[in-house]
Amino acid sequence: MRKLIYFSIIFFCFSCDNKKEPIPSYYQELEDLREINDQLIKSNSKDLSSIYQLGISIKNQSLNLYVRYHKNFNDEENEFLLQCAATGSEAAQKYKDAVDYFLKAQRKFPESDNAPVYLHNRARILDNILMDKNNARLAFEELIELYPNHPLSENSKVYLDNVFGKSNEEILNILK
């Protein structure tokens, strides 16, 4: 009986391994991406070279993680990856890519609190940077239609009615 008790104690001690499960490497990669994204947010807006490099890094890392591990991540994490792809593309001056990723983020997560922001950023880039006025108008109108009560929709209505497509001279005359 004594041997059985000793055997049970030894068995219990060895079976109670207090080792923690290792965190999968893709979660560490996601945390690394969060840190780089925070660097971009905190960066000096006049340091264009640094912003460009951070943008390239964020875009590449987020897309790499999304393509390889999107099934392992929850919706919030996948949305973050698409958001990073979009903002990284914009910071890296890859504006057509940014427009596409903002649209993809909104389409994949239309109920997200950030969905109207994605559409607004898409419209802003189309309008002010790519100078694609037709698609910019459509993007603003889509924002207004899908999220009519959001403050960005209200701003977009005012913008389309009063400023969109007008020259600087026409805008100055409106302000007088």
Where are these regions (language model features)?
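Short solvent-exposed coil/turn linkers within tandem alpha-helical repeat scaffolds
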Residues: 67-78, 107-115, 130, 144-156
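C-terminal motif of bacterial Sec signal peptides marking the signal peptidase cleavage site
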Residues: 12-15
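Structural motif corresponding to the intra-repeat A-B loop/turn of tetratricopeptide repeats
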Residues: 92, 129-130
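Bacterial signal peptide processing site
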Residues: 17-19
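Terminal, low-structured helical/coil segments at or just beyond the last alpha-helical repeat
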Residues: 137-138, 142-176
